[in-house]
């Protein structure tokens, strides 16, 4: 049965992380037939520590920076005895409990990767698996994540010591022993905050530097005695005013970054993806972490910085982000350019209305239950309950949405997919309602 834009057909889900299995649950609820392929031996994706597929970026000490109050699935509450910020093992167990509670495990095909996905002339998708088999689907749902294809900047010179991207960092001792070493972390995101705080402890690194090309605002995990993300501004408050009030509260709470010896940010709080840490600023203030500016070049057993200074370095951890990649597509239309991949409601590329990207965003405060919301529109479309607007309108909405969600962020690869979770979901539900009206009008 070829894709005709209306008939249910069969769906293929690529990946069984939190985006993939919440989509599977939604399709199961609708009674829509689907296959879900996971290249690893179990669910969890990025939150599966030491995932045998090599694509997890979990390190042993990792706790999620989103509080339990904001990451719970709608119909499956988190355990009452959880701490405010659960460890990755607790989050993974929550995922397992969800999958087993809703009977999803038997619907997932493990140890099977999607090698290629090609759109046919009739609109269907030919999906070739690592088993060598090719199957045809009317709907394709991509949930392969965007925190696995590590990006390492290219600097002149050579470095003779140990190098690792934060994606492959696991703990201070294995696979590399950082004890007694002069270590440099490169980057200013959450992984950089966590790993520098961990390795800077005196029994571990002899000396730890952090190199940032630009200053960032490091936000606390707690404000006024509660998780910072638990405080939600009233929904009636205009977005710009809410952002202004939040900025004022942040500055009052943490002061100026340069007062800690860090580079002065060239932007306001919340004009960049927040770096969140309850420990980093204290370790900088205690002299355990030594801030440095941008790298000029690598220099054998050391690094030369833009200000002309040089530091002897034994090991570098590159906490420099990720590329957005879809290795199973072979058409330029479906490749991200400079990490930019504009989509209608962060889900659909106009002209490919039977292809959905789930979880392909950097939502504040969390990605964990983001696709659970997206799956509502996706399933409604497959079930014939929702219709997209005309292509021209979809293109216009993409531009408007990107201006709304990205307009206040400084230009950087990490800011190509930012969305405000609450504003996004509110707008998505409005679009879902409008699309249902369109579907009824043409029925």
Q: Could you tell me what each predicted segment is?
A:
Residues 63-66:
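Flexible "cap/lid" subdomain of the alpha/beta-hydrolase fold that forms the substrate-access gate
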Residues 232:
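Conformationally flexible catalytic loops at phosphate/diphosphate-handling active centers
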Residues 396-409:
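Short, mixed-charge aromatic SLiMs
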Residues 2-61, 77-216, 221-222, 235-391, ...:
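Flavin (primarily FAD) cofactor-binding/catalytic cores of flavoenzymes
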Residues 69-70:
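Aromatic- and acidic-residue-enriched carbohydrate-binding clefts of CAZyme catalytic domains
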